[in-house]
Structure formats: structure tokens, C-alpha cells
Amino acid sequence: MKNTQILILDFGSQYTQLLARRVREANIYTEVLPFDTSIEKIKEYPLLKGIILSGGPSSVYLQNAYKIDSEILNLDIAILGVCYGMQLLTQYFQGAVELADEQEFGKAIITIDDKKNPLFKNVTTESQVWMSHADHVTELPVDFKQIAHSNASIAAIAHNTKPIYGIQFHAEVTHSLQGKEMLENFLYDIAKCNKDWNLDDFIDQQIKEIKETVKDKQVILGLSGGVDSSVAAAIIGKAIGKQLTCIFVDTGLLRKNETIEVMKAYETNFDINIKLVEASDLFFSELKGIKEPEAKRKIIGKCFIDVFTDAARQHKDADFLAQGTIYPDVIESSSHGASSKTIKSHHNVGGLPEDLKFRLIEPLRNLFKDEVRQVGFKLGLPEEMINRHPFPGPGLGIRVIEEVTKDKVEILQEADAIFIKKLREWNLYNTVSQAFVTLLPVKTVGVMGDNRTYDYVVALRSVNTIDFMTATSTHLPWEFLDEVVNEIINKVDNVNRVVYDVTSKPPGTIEWE
């Protein structure tokens, strides 16, 4: 790779991916690696300009605290410790970190003590930041100075002679109002990175590599209808055309008319081979009687792999398997040791039998979701395909709460289609990050005409988010919601009540299951 590089060592912060995206947004290539990555591995990056130590949930003074290879600190590169990362630097350089009497969580104001420090170029003397720490630095490390403080703690430190910095706050979070400036100061002025990461070069490089790797062989790819697999198909198809065969599995758990729409979209926009596999009966049979969300996810994942495997075996001439894996999948599926606990299982990364012996092609594995969308636009994919809201791998199987049946899915499909249609009619669809309907496992009493009803409840959900790591509910117009509710009640059989979910993430997740 010809680009200058920044590495992020991950100690399990919920903001690590956001931190990586901020670096990418600065047109600098970055990768996230486990906190215990060896010095030998790090030296494999020839144009490495700096390392960022992420935040994390642990405490540096605990016996089993997460550590880095101390040789990293002897490299002739810039280093920035964020939150836990700053405390780790403090400990390595013989300072002191203790549990704070006055802990800081949320918005805080820091005061810059060293206005001439390059980290704070074009930053005001007082600046709002986002704090999330129970521990604090009580004694400066040797050869370091304090360059910023808050009411409760040392907020930033800098080495006297080396380009090593620590910040106690999360500059990557938008609540840190000048965090972008601080990060860019570190990247451009301290680490001396070039703005040389761009997606046009990425596309050209991927097409070249795919051609050189595949040559005259065949490739198969599992299509979901989502953005990731669509863009993966587009970039591979641009490289090798009809040598790519896409397999689309109809699980029965897709949105209303999705199978028809997806097949039409691919046939219209791609010069590739597409095969449809109808497997809904299998999925409904395997899900019968299953209520627990994680069990449903695993069953759906296994069924998909079994169906895809059977279809793949029919393509005996295929040497390569392509996947729409993106960088968050890679980060979350890697063993970081320090990483946050698994919240929900991912079923779409790996899992195919070893005897298939495919070689893997993952052209998007180094891109974040927003970058994938940009690549899709650059490749000429239609806007409605690229800007489609995210859809979970298990599909409506996790939007029907508890047991999934064909009848329940049909109810949900109708209600969801009305909600999405209305969002488009009101020109709201592209103003929200994700919107959908969930079918609840409860019935309520209602009145329809002169008759008593006892039918299901559906919940509308619409959120806005930058990165899907945190999200807030959308403040949709009351008149809009009233119109949606009326149409669902009047047109969807077996539903007599509609609620609107206003829970943020956290404490909730975006999906109900």
C-alpha cells in the first residue's frame, strides 16, 4: 500500500470504530488492531506515521489490565492515547492513575493550558468535550507536561521531547465540539500524515487485484439485496463480468415484494449471472416453536449457510467465494481480547463447510458503511439501492418478536410496507437512518365499527445516527404518524394498535431482538 498509515490499538472502547472513521474522513488510511499486537506485526506497516491507543472499560492499575508491547513506545512515530490510552501512557512513563472521587461522564469543559501546543492549533481556550472515565491521572508521567485540564482532572498531556500525547476525553465523539480539529492536528501536524486515502484509487486498485487474482476462474457471491453485497457484486462484476454468479436466497423473511424487486434491480443494473433459490418453507419449519432471539439468529444463519452451500456445490467450476464483508464485521469478528462483549451474534461472516475449499474475495473488507455507499455511487448504482435503509441479516425473523410464522411475517410485511411508503411520500425516507416495523407478541382489545377486536400490536421504529453505535429516535411529525397509523389499522388484517418506539441507543438497541 502506498498510503501513509495510522494504526488504532483497540482496548474495547465503544467508540473505536468511530475513531477509525474520523481518521478515514481525514483522508488517511487506518486499521484497527488488537491491543496486544506485537511490535513485529506493527513493523510490517512500511508507511506507518502514528498509533492511537483507544479508550476501554478496564483500569490500568488492575492485575490483568490490558497492556501494549512496550517496544511500540520506542518507535519513531507519533502516539496518541485516548482516555484509557492516556492512562496507559501515564503508567508506562511512571506517572500515577487512581480511581477518581469525582468521576466524569458526559459533556465537560476543558481549559487549554498550552495554547501553543500543536495539538490545540485553532482550538479555543475553553472547549466542550465528551468524558467517559472513572479513573484519572493523579501524577504526571516523567518527561510529560499538562496541556489541558477540566474541573475534575488532567485533560491532556504531552511529552516534552517526543510526539507522544494523551487526552482524557473522546475527541472522536461529536459532543467534543472541536474534537475534529484536535484529531486532524495530531494526524497532519504531529504525525505528518498525507491526505492520500481516496475511494477512486481504492476502486481502481480493487478491480486490478480482482482481475489478477481470479484470472479466468469463476466466482460465486451470496446476494442479500442490501448495500454491502450489492456494491461487492458491482465492483467484482466490473472486474470480471459474467465470471461472477450471484445466488439470492429467498428465506421468506424478506420485506414485501423484496425478492421480485431485488431480482429486477440486479438484472437491470448488473451484467452478471443471478440464481434465485426459494427456501422459505425450510426457514419457517426450522423456526417453529423458537422464541429466544439468539436461538432464532443461529437457526436462520445455519439455514442460510446450508441452502447457500447446496447451491454453491452445484457450481463445481467456481474457485472463489465473494462476500460483502465490511470493516466493522472484521473488527467485531476478530479476537481483540479487550473488546466489548458480544451483544448479538453475526451469522454472515464465515461458517461455510471447509470441504468447499473456496478462496475468499472480500473487496470491501477495509471499508466502513459510509465508504461502501460512496463506492456504490461511484460505480453507478441507483440511488434507491444505495440509500436503502439497513436490513438485518436474519431479516424479519428478528422483527417478529418471539415465534416466527408465515402468517405473522405477512402481517409485518404489510405494515412495514405502509410505513416505508409513507416515509417516501412525505420525503422523510432519506432524512432518517433506519425505519421499520416490529410485530409484538401481544394482542389488545379494540373496536372496529360496532365489533370488539382482539388483535396484534405493531411498533414503528425510526432512528437517526451517524454510525449506528449510538442512535436517537426520530421526531417524526405527529400528522405523519397519525396518517401511518390510520392506514395500517384500516388496511392490515389482525392489527388493531400501533405504537411508536422512542427509545435511544443506548439503553436500547436499534432492533428489538
UniProtKB/Swiss-Prot annotation:
GO molecular function: ATP binding; GMP synthase activity
Disulfide bridge partners, by residue number: none
CDD domains, sorted: GATase1_GMP_Synthase, GMP_synthase_C
Record keywords, A-Z: ATP-binding, Glutamine amidotransferase, GMP biosynthesis, Ligase, Nucleotide-binding, Purine biosynthesis
Protein EC: 6.3.5.2
Catalysed reactions, as listed in the record: XMP + L-glutamine + ATP + H2O = GMP + L-glutamate + AMP + diphosphate + 2 H(+)
Pfam family name, one: NAD_synthase
Domain Glutamine amidotransferase type-1: 5-196
GO cellular component: cytosol
Binding residues for ATP: 224-230
Active site: 83, 170, 172
Enzyme class, UniProt record, top EC level: ligase
Pathway: Purine metabolism; GMP biosynthesis; GMP from XMP (L-Gln route): step 1/1
Keyword ATP-binding: yes
Ranges of residues in domain GMPS ATP-PPase: 197-388
HAMAP family per UniProt: GMP_synthase
Subunit annotation: Homodimer.
Its biological purpose: Catalyzes the synthesis of GMP from XMP.
Record-given protein name: GMP synthase [glutamine-hydrolyzing]
Organism this protein belongs to: Mesoplasma florum (strain ATCC 33453 / NBRC 100688 / NCTC 11704 / L1)
